[in-house]
Design a protein with these regions (language model features):
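Charged, alpha-helix-forming regions
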Residues: 1-252
Length: 252
């Protein structure tokens, strides 16, 4: 027997894009609440995963190498900054995964990391949680194709998020990628589930700023189509053209 109130709550949770992770590329859209430094640290952690990575694999990060990659000095202040960022990642990367037991739908509430161990030698050992691993591995294998050196050039938080959205929506090395979403979905991807802006401010302060940074630092062109219901903005379709890839239409 189903509980009607419980079923309604579950349906609401399942319909919210900020809650549900159903495949690897959804993981790229899940952490809009993180700051730019935390996004860079998370991407650095993801970079340890390769096609040969094994379940329950333990990864080791050297803070000195991380700081060098970030262009920061090996000072006590920066070491502390890294540890604080790991603390934020540990506390703010909750995952909500769809489950089904004996034909009954539900949600598993879990987290991205199984553990993060910091040692006074400057080493950090971490493991992705048992239930997050398949999504992390799928993300790295099928979606994330940019290199750490490319990530290092991107400074803004929103540009980093847009870069991830691009990779999460892209099929292999396609020249053209379309990203579609409602205004609510776009705001969730960039701002998380708590903060909201007017459509005008969101366009000017978030999307425009992110797009301009990627166009400036990567060889791409971004075209945005604003979807409206009358005068009300209801969503966006973004076309990203990767000029590094050949334009096959010239041969048609």
């Amino acid at each position: 027997m189903k509980n009607k109130k419980s079923s309604k709550v579950l349906e609401e949770l399942l319909s919210r894009s900020d809650y549900l992770v159903v495949q690897g590329n959804d993981l790229a859209k899940s952490f809009g609440n993180l700051k730019a430094f935390e996004h860079k640290l998370l991407d650095y952690c993801f970079s340890f995963v390769t096609k040969d990575s094994k379940p329950e694999e333990r990864f080791t990060l050297k803070i000195a190498e991380l700081l060098k990659y970030l262009g920061l000095t090996s000072s006590g202040t920066n070491y502390e900054r890294v540890i604080r960022a790991f603390k934020v990642l540990n506390e703010n990367t909750a995952l909500y995964l769809p489950i089904e037991e004996n034909g009954v739908k539900g949600i598993m509430m879990t987290q991205l990391f199984g553990y993060i161990n910091y040692l006074e030698t400057g080493l950090v050992h971490f493991e992705f949680s048992k239930y997050a691993q398949p999504y992390v591995f799928d993300l790295r294998k099928n979606f994330y194709s940019f290199k750490l050196r490319e990530l290092a050039r991107i400074k803004g938080k929103y540009a980093l998020i847009l870069l991830k959205l691009w990779e999460a929506s892209r099929f292999r090395d396609n020249r053209i990628t379309l990203i579609n979403g409602t205004l609510e979905e776009w705001q969730t991807w960039f701002l998380g589930s708590e903060k909201r802006l007017t459509a005008g401010k969101f366009m000017q302060n978030i999307i425009k700023r992110a797009a301009e940074e990627l166009e400036e630092k990567l060889n791409i062109e971004i075209i945005l189509d604003t979807k409206k219901d009358g005068r009300k903005v209801v969503g966006y379709e973004m076309e990203i053209i990767d000029k590094r890839q050949p334009d096959l239409t010239i041969f048609e």
